Amino acid sequence: MEKKTLSLCPICLKRIPATILEEDGKIIIKKTCPEHGEFKDIYWGDAELYKKFDKYEFIGKIEVTNTKVKNGCPYDCGLCPNHKSTTILANIDVTNRCNLNCPICFANANKSGKVYEPSFEDIKRMMENLRKEIPPTPAIQFAGGEPTVRSDLPELIKLARDMGFLHVQLATNGIKLKNINYLKKLKEAGLSTIYLQFDGISEKPYLVARGKNLLPIKQKVIENCKKVGFDSVVLVPTLVRGVNDNEVGGIIRYAAENVDVVRGINFQPVSFTGRVDEKTLLEGRITIPDFIKLVEEQTDGEITEEDFYPVPSVAPISVLVEKLTNDRKPTLSSHQHCGTSTYVFVDEDGKLIPITRFIDVEGFLEIVKEKIEEIGKSKMHDVKVLGEIALKLPSLIDLDKAPKSVNIKKIIDLILSVLKSDYSALAELHYHMLMISCMHFMDAYNFDVKRVMRCCIHYATPDDRIIPFCTYNTLHRQEVEEKFSIPLEEWKRMHKIGGEDDREDY
C-alpha cells in the first residue's frame, strides 16, 4: 500500500510531497525537504485498522467559500474552494489570556507579551459569518486562552443562542467554574456543554502539564454541575506518552461513575512543535490505534477495537435525513483517519457495555444506505421510508445482551426522531450513553493535505475567514493573533490591571 499526498516541512513549513506507506505493520508518512532533509513519522499505528477505516471514506461538499485558491492547500484558508466539508463545530478564541501559566504552553498572553481578544462586535460578526454557511454552522465553542477570564462570556453565550446556534460549548480549565454562582450564570445564558480540560485521575499529569495539581478543581466542577443540574460535561485529556497514557482506563471509569453529568470523553494525543528528533517523535507519537489498544487493555476488554468506528461512518445518516427533509444538513464528512468514537452504556453494576454489543451497527448503516438508493430511484415518501426502518430496527437489537437499565423502545423512538431531523432527539439520545472518542489533530510532522481538506472542525477569525483546525494551529494562528493583538502592558493599562503576576486577570 502506498499513497501520495502533500505535507509540510516541520522546519520551514513549506509544502512538500509526501508518501504514506505500510512498514512493519504500521502506516508511515515520509517526506523530504530540499533544504532540511528527510522526515519520517508514524501516521497510523496499525495498518490493518487503517485499511478497515478506509472503507468508511465519505467525501462531502461546501457551497459557501470565503477565499480564493491562490497558493494552494494549506495556504488559502478559508474556507477555499478546495475544501470538502462544511463546519460542524466552530471554534472562536475569545482571548489568549489565561488564569494558568502551564509549562507546556507558549501561546498565552503571559508568554507572548501580547493580548489577542476580539471585541464583542468582532465575535458577533464572526458568528454571523458562520451562520452564512450552507447549512449554517450548528455548533460553536468558545475557547482561548481561558475564555472564562472574559467578563462578557455569558452575553456571548446568549448571543450565540439568539443567533440560532443549536449547541454552544465552552472549552475551559474549570478554575472559574468552582464558583457555583458563575456556573449558574453560564447555564442560564444557554450554555450547552462544558468541554473540560481533564488530564488524569492522579496528580502527575497536572504537575507535568499544568505546573500544579488541578485534579481537586476538576472534581469540584463535576460536583457543582450535579448541584445545579448541568448535565453535559465532556472530559478532554491531552494524551502524552509516559505522563498519562496509563490513566486512559481510569479516566473512562471516572466518567462512568459520573455519567449523570459526564456525556463523554474526547482524548486528544499531544501534537509536536518545533524541532523534534526522529527517535523522540517515533517513541512519543500516540495514534488512534494506539489509543484504542490502551482502552482495550485498561478496561479489561470491556471496550475493544471492534467497538470503534471512524467519524464519517455516520455521514450516510445525514444524507438520508437530507433526502427525507429536502434540506441540507450538517454532515460529519471528516477524513476517515482523523477521529474515532464509540458509545457505551453504564449498567447498574457499573459495567461498560458498548452499543455494538447489542445493536448491529453495520446492519443499521446498510439499511440507511439502501433507503438512500431507494429514495433516489423511486421518490419514496418519507413516511413509508421511516415505517420500513421502524419495522427493521428491532431485528438489529439483541435484547439478551442489552443493559437492563436501557429502555430499548425509547432508543428506537429516538433514532426514528433523529431521522426526522429532530435535534432535541439527538441530544436526548446522547444522554442515554457515554461517548468515548479520540481526535488526532495534526502537526507539521504528520501533516496530510488530504486530511485537512476534509476537516469539519474550524476556527472563525476576525478577518472573516473560517480555517480548518490543523492548519490554524500549524500555520495561521501566529499570523492571525499578531495581526489582531495589542501589547500586554498596553492592554493592562487600558483595563487598569496592576501587579506582576495576577493569574486571575491575565
UniProtKB/Swiss-Prot annotation:
Tell me which residues make up the Radical SAM core domain.
82-300
What Pfam families does this protein map onto? Fer4_12, Radical_SAM, Zn_ribbon_HMPTM
Please give the annotated consequence of changing C77A.
Loss of C9-methylation but C7-methylation is still observed
The entry's stated outcome for C102A is: Loss of methylation activity
> What sort of enzyme, by top EC class, is this?
transferase
Keyword 4Fe-4S annotated: yes
Recite the UniProt cofactor note for this protein: Binds 2 [4Fe-4S] clusters. The clusters are coordinated with 3 cysteines and an exchangeable S-adenosyl-L-methionine. Binds 2 S-adenosyl-L-methionine per subunit.
Q: Where does [4Fe-4S] cluster 1 bind?
A: C73, C77, C80
**Keywords assigned by UniProt, alphabetized:** 4Fe-4S, Iron, Iron-sulfur, Metal-binding, Methyltransferase, S-adenosyl-L-methionine, Transferase
Pathway, per UniProt? Cofactor biosynthesis; 5,6,7,8-tetrahydromethanopterin biosynthesis
List the InterPro entries hit by this protein, alphabetically: Aldolase_TIM, GDGT/MA_synthase, Methyltransferase_Class_D, rSAM, Zn_ribbon_HMPTM
Which cofactors does this gene product need?
[4Fe-4S] cluster; S-adenosyl-L-methionine
- Which biological process, per GO, is one annotated for this protein? methylation
Please verify whether the record's keywords include S-adenosyl-L-methionine: yes
**Coiled-coil annotated spans:** none
Instruction: List ligand-binding residues for [4Fe-4S] cluster 2.
Output: C98, C102, C105
GO molecular function terms attached to this record: 4 iron, 4 sulfur cluster binding; metal ion binding; methyltransferase activity
Task: Please state the Enzyme Commission number of this protein.
Answer: 2.1.1.-
Q: Which SUPFAM superfamilies match?
A: Radical SAM enzymes
User: Would you identify the family this protein belongs to, as annotated?
Assistant: Belongs to the radical SAM superfamily.
What function is annotated for this protein? Answer: Catalyzes methylation of 7,8-dihydro-6-hydroxymethylpterin, likely using methylenetetrahydromethanopterin as a methyl group donor, via a radical-based mechanism.
Which protein are we looking at?
7,8-dihydro-6-hydroxymethylpterin dimethyltransferase
The organism named in the record is: Methanocaldococcus jannaschii (strain ATCC 43067 / DSM 2661 / JAL-1 / JCM 10045 / NBRC 100440)
